[in-house]
Amino acid sequence: MALGRTGAGAAVRARLALGLALASILSGPPAAACPTKCTCSAASVDCHGLGLRAVPRGIPRNAERLDLDRNNITRITKMDFAGLKNLRVLHLEDNQVSIIERGAFQDLKQLERLRLNKNKLQVLPELLFQSTPKLTRLDLSENQIQGIPRKAFRGVTGVKNLQLDNNHISCIEDGAFRALRDLEILTLNNNNISRILVTSFNHMPKIRTLRLHSNHLYCDCHLAWLSDWLRQRRTIGQFTLCMAPVHLRGFSVADVQKKEYVCPGPHSEAPACNANSLSCPSACSCSNNIVDCRGKGLTEIPANLPEGIVEIRLEQNSIKSIPAGAFTQYKKLKRIDISKNQISDIAPDAFQGLKSLTSLVLYGNKITEIPKGLFDGLVSLQLLLLNANKINCLRVNTFQDLQNLNLLSLYDNKLQTISKGLFVPLQSIQTLHLAQNPFVCDCHLKWLADYLQDNPIETSGARCSSPRRLANKRISQIKSKKFRCSGSEDYRNRFSSECFMDLVCPEKCRCEGTIVDCSNQKLARIPSHLPEYTTDLRLNDNDISVLEATGIFKKLPNLRKINLSNNRIKEVREGAFDGAAGVQELMLTGNQLETMHGRMFRGLSSLKTLMLRSNLISCVSNDTFAGLSSVRLLSLYDNRITTITPGAFTTLVSLSTINLLSNPFNCNCHMAWLGRWLRKRRIVSGNPRCQKPFFLKEIPIQDVAIQDFTCDGNEESSCQLSPRCPEQCTCVETVVRCSNRGLHALPKGMPKDVTELYLEGNHLTAVPKELSAFRQLTLIDLSNNSISMLTNHTFSNMSHLSTLILSYNRLRCIPVHAFNGLRSLRVLTLHGNDISSVPEGSFNDLTSLSHLALGTNPLHCDCSLRWLSEWVKAGYKEPGIARCSSPESMADRLLLTTPTHRFQCKGPVDINIVAKCNACLSSPCKNNGTCSQDPVEQYRCTCPYSYKGKDCTVPINTCVQNPCEHGGTCHLSENLRDGFSCSCPLGFEGQRCEINPDDCEDNDCENSATCVDGINNYACLCPPNYTGELCDEVIDYCVPEMNLCQHEAKCISLDKGFRCECVPGYSGKLCETNNDDCVAHKCRHGAQCVDEVNGYTCICPQGFSGLFCEHPPPMVLLQTSPCDQYECQNGAQCIVVQQEPTCRCPPGFAGPRCEKLITVNFVGKDSYVELASAKVRPQANISLQVATDKDNGILLYKGDNDPLALELYQGHVRLVYDSLSSPPTTVYSVETVNDGQFHSVELVMLNQTLNLVVDKGAPKSLGKLQKQPAVGSNSPLYLGGIPTSTGLSALRQGADRPLGGFHGCIHEVRINNELQDFKALPPQSLGVSPGCKSCTVCRHGLCRSVEKDSVVCECHPGWTGPLCDQEARDPCLGHSCRHGTCMATGDSYVCKCAEGYGGALCDQKNDSASACSAFKCHHGQCHISDRGEPYCLCQPGFSGHHCEQENPCMGEIVREAIRRQKDYASCATASKVPIMECRGGCGSQCCQPIRSKRRKYVFQCTDGSSFVEEVERHLECGCRACS
């Protein structure tokens, strides 16, 4: 498009965006979404070089090519490529992939090319490619693969190119390549191969390229076969050299003589190798079948361990779960140690099949429940350590297969009871540890006391925790009769054998039936133990801010409803609802959610109701509701949503109700799809409305025309991801620096995966609470701020934090639990603060601390700080810088070197030191003020009413502030709590005279009157027909003194008031109006009409007579006035002005003699006025005035190649210009013109621009157009409507086009300032009357002019009569049609006969067979018409009454634009192309093109692009043999 460089750019972008929106809507459902940051084109998805750490979600299912190369992906899981059944090419090269789960490629049935080179693969899992039968090229080069297992390539028989070079391969198992019968290229160079079995290449008949060079080939007798094999194939395997023995090193394998391939000693079989035995995880060490991974920071169980391992050590890592079958394949395992991790979830089959396992160590984790069957089959187990966990229940059959168990430790757990029979299978048990459990010693634990007395194997001293009478007593020493049950205890423990201990209601919650109500309890997180029977979980009105992925819902199989309304939820972590497959209703109303992602609702597969009302959501993206196919009701009411991404609701296939109200929708091009979706989907939506742009405000989205959803080119969708770095900071990978930025709070937009955060040199007064959400932090620098106090558990969530810098702040106090949870902290800097004391136990959790900086603090070294001195000396964690400041005897002594016995307490401690941790101890609040601690100001005083100031020391006169309301008088009173009292005026009461008592509580109002409260009184508001102070007096409006009816009207009393019946000639509520009967007078020859009651009189000019002055004078008198010979037209009156005749024109006419008709009234249904096109030039100015009270209609229409129209649309003026070379453009007036008053409308065409001006306001421009509008062509210009034969086919807009004509007045039409005369109206201008008098004759119909001064009425359905005032009678009632259907035609009807009958009443039977037998159709088929007459329906290419004439083969030229679809854009030729269509008959041949030529045409697309394509054009038609 050749457009201007300035303002036109925005217009072009708007048109292109609109075109794209139209194309996407018209083409059906929106295409699948593209993953974030990736680029999607047709069936290709490009995500290369984006720094991705995992395969992105949301890959389109129709993708055929996927580029994920040059990222940081480390693992390929089973779900990464699930469902991509059309994928043919997959690029994963140049990543960090070290693990590929088995089954990762199971859905890739069409995969042909796979690149995995330049990764970190060490092990190639067997059967990895068995589900990719069409794979032809596989690149595994430049990895760390150590061996090729026998089943590595099972199932990929079609592979032609396999690249394994530049790995660490030392073992190729026998038969590894057996399936590769079509292999042509195999690269094994640059590996560690020393031996190759003789059968390795036997099944490769098509091999043409083999690379074996740069290996460690040992040329002994076992490799002699390879020499013969290579000599027979000289073109492959070149440069394959021996590396051993020494005397053959460097020789070509093919050139060494067979006799030199010898083995020392007797010949034996080639030593076999095991590929799996070579694998060892990169972070671990492997030797003697023992894998040691201790303290390596692992977060999951390593995959691809050597198959023959007997022991694995995984203690002191960060593993959180043990997945299904984690150890199943390692059948020789004897010892597993996973102690001191973070394990909370164990799959039931994690240890399945380990029959050789003798030792299992799981202590020091977070296990709460042992899954059913976890230890089944472990028949050799002798040692099982489960101590230091959180186990609260054990099923009775937990240890059923552990007959050989010697030692079982359940020490330090949460067990309250143990089911009888739990230890029965333990036939070999020798030692049992049960201490440090909160045992409830009731009747259900009686068996344990008996068991321990009979089997003294419990050596840890297990004791009772409750009831109080048995508390702290050893279970083995209590007599069995002491174990008794109350009713509640019996209910609680009845089902403990099946782990139904959770029948106990969680603390702070209320349980009734299956409802667990934990609402309004100030909970910060979901309780960790909930009853398994829970169906309805109520957590509303709490303080929950983050929904963690704790797996809690996996333990609640019966859960159906979750209420989380009215919390503070800002984030829902991925996997938070895992296990909630049965939940049908989720309430998240009244929270602080700002963004949503598709993974936050994962697991809610059965959800039917989702309430997200009253949050802060600003955008709904197309993956937000992925997987929620069962949702029927979705509420997004009262959020901040401005845009919704196309396809956002596509996955909600069951949706029937959606509430989108009270959202600030911006109806730009990003929202175009929603209006169409709302119209197409018949669901309850609440009819959401636009709020922007201004001209669409409060208009329902589904009512907005598609072309009105526009963008100005600068707008972005609010669904775009916010920047991953705060605006005030700089970010490099996961390091964020916000130093010296003057910050008072933590900046927004902090990346969730931040590991190092620098906030030094700002104005922070406290440690930001938001830091607890960033759990990956390893370093925080908060130095040089103004932090004065820490709170307990400030850093408890930061388990990875290793460095914490708090130096040079204003810290005065360290709470005892301030550093709880910092078990990984190595460096703590508190240098340069105001700390005097550190409470004992403050550093209990700092088990990894190696450096403590406490220098430049005024330490008070008395006995309370002795512990710190000992602690520092024990590990030399403080470098000898911290010095004591007080007491005087310890001043300037080093904390590290001063002997411990010198830390003594002598006398009271200075109050200023003690008050550092509690400023209120110094009693700063005076005059009985209440002191409370403040983290910023140290303390805050709440003053009594008569004092103010920081310390409540400033007295105030309470009466000065006039606390008494409503004119009450204030009196000072020291005896009262507030220091004053009020004397209230009459009618008020209360301490401050703030209460106006309701005097209507006891009122005397009668006759259902309404009492209105006053001040110390009330008033009665009377119903109609009643009056009086108490509404007890009846009003008769029709008595003479009350009658308001005028002009002798009759007054009629009603229940509520009265009614006046007017005499003829008067109207109005009180008959006060004398009707103007002159409105439709018939006075002629300029007679004056004088209104009378119910009539009028014509005062005739001199010489005229008759009732209507219709009779002219009998003779022409001598001229006595200048008007005598001056003829005024159109009923105008001649008057003399300054001795000159002047015509006073009636409304609607102008000119010296009123000869021009300048105002017309459009009253008909299809009325219009046609103006000749010669009056319009290419550069023109068209102006007119309009008056109407209608919302829609056509004002002006010019139809040609580039049609334009001026229309009324919803009360505004709309200008539409449609050029085939670009999308239609539209502009609206700001002003509305449907108020019945005259408004000026002006259209200016100049220099390829179209401008609209309404009421002399600011012009609205369509901008620079591609070419000058072709308004100067020969097509006519229509006003007020268009002929029905023309229609609006030239315009390409949709169903919102106002096809109806204009109803109202058009006045003073000027074209290029030339006033147009409507007097010579063409014949078709019916329904157009001169002047601006509205037609009110037709009661139930439309007026249509038939002559200059008369109209006829076109009645609406159901009405008839000359004035459409008579209800129509159905003419088909009692019809006489015998064998047919009655069809109404106005006041009559006709009969539509059934087949085989004819006649006016369908009473004559036709013999169709005989009728057609005498009527021959040569090239067609005979049919019988409705009248019973035969006729011929001709075959193509024939015509005539009997189809006897063959049409000659001819070419017919049709001019139209050729269209193409390019991706998502619609493209068309820039101009119309002449196309020849061949039609006609050719006997036995066919009418076809016989001459054609190809020509290049430019196609312009709606996305702004263009291209050139050759198009074949037919030039001549003729008869040719049919093909």
UniProtKB/Swiss-Prot annotation:
Instruction: Report the glycosylation sites.
Output: 72, 192, 563, 622, 784, 792, 797, 928, 1025, 1181, 1247, 1406
Task: Please verify whether the record's keywords include Secreted.
Answer: yes
Gene name as annotated: Slit3
Signal peptide limits: 1-33
Residue ranges annotated for the LRRNT domain, each copy included:
34-61, 271-307, 496-532, 716-752
GO molecular function terms here?
calcium ion binding; Roundabout binding; signaling receptor binding
Q: What is this protein called?
A: Slit homolog 3 protein
Pfam families (alphabetical): EGF (PF00008), hEGF (PF12661), Laminin_G_2 (PF02210), LRR_8 (PF13855), LRRCT (PF01463), LRRNT (PF01462)
